[in-house]
């Protein structure tokens, strides 16, 4: 079973939201943005409900600073999107949380996936929302995530294609190397 929780900094203790708001207005020119909220979303599989409840209070959040909920309150938001690391990209937040839960339980390490959920408030056009997404999502390390709760966190990865092997590379002359570069689309 997959458990999900959302953790948000308390109002007045959320500098990341303030920084996003300032950057969007000043650098992106998104003047219609009046507020932003950010949640850290944790999906956890491989633990029992009592351990998950304990982890919500002791691993995923700092009770004096954070609000923990089962759902992100995005009722009046004009746009909501989530950002997660690309598959294969190391997720330090998820790994650290999994290690902490393993220490708490003295058992197996659970599977954890994290994402940041952004809610934007104000009068925004589709172009404004896309500009904010482009600003927040670094395509080298992250992608837009689904807002739906997954059935499982097990990854199903496709078998990678066979990599081409170049025979006789070390004995090629300049003309053959040049032809190889252009035929394989190589840069150097």
Question: For each of these PLM feature ranges, what is it?
Answer:
Residues 1-188:
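Core nucleic-acid recognition elements
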């Amino acid at each position: 079973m997959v458990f999900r929780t959302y953790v948000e900094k308390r109002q007045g203790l959320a500098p990341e939201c303030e920084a996003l708001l300032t950057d969007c207005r000043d650098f992106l020119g998104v003047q219609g943005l009046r507020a932003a909220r950010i949640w850290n979303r944790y999906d956890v599989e491989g633990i029992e409900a009592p351990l998950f409840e304990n982890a919500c209070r002791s691993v995923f959040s700092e009770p004096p600073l954070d609000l923990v909920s089962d759902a992100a309150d995005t009722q009046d938001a004009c746009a909501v999107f989530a950002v997660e690391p690309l598959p294969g990209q190391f997720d330090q937040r998820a790994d650290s949380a999994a290690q902490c839960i393993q220490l708490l339980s003295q058992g197996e390490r659970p599977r954890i996936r994290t994402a940041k959920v952004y809610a934007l408030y104000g009068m925004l056009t589709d172009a404004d929302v896309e500009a904010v997404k482009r600003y927040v999502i670094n395509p080298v390390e992250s992608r837009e995530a689904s807002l739906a709760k997954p059935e499982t966190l097990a990854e199903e990865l496709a078998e990678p294609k066979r990599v081409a092997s170049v025979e006789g590379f070390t004995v090629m002359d300049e003309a053959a190397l040049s032809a190889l570069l252009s035929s394989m689309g190589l840069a150097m």
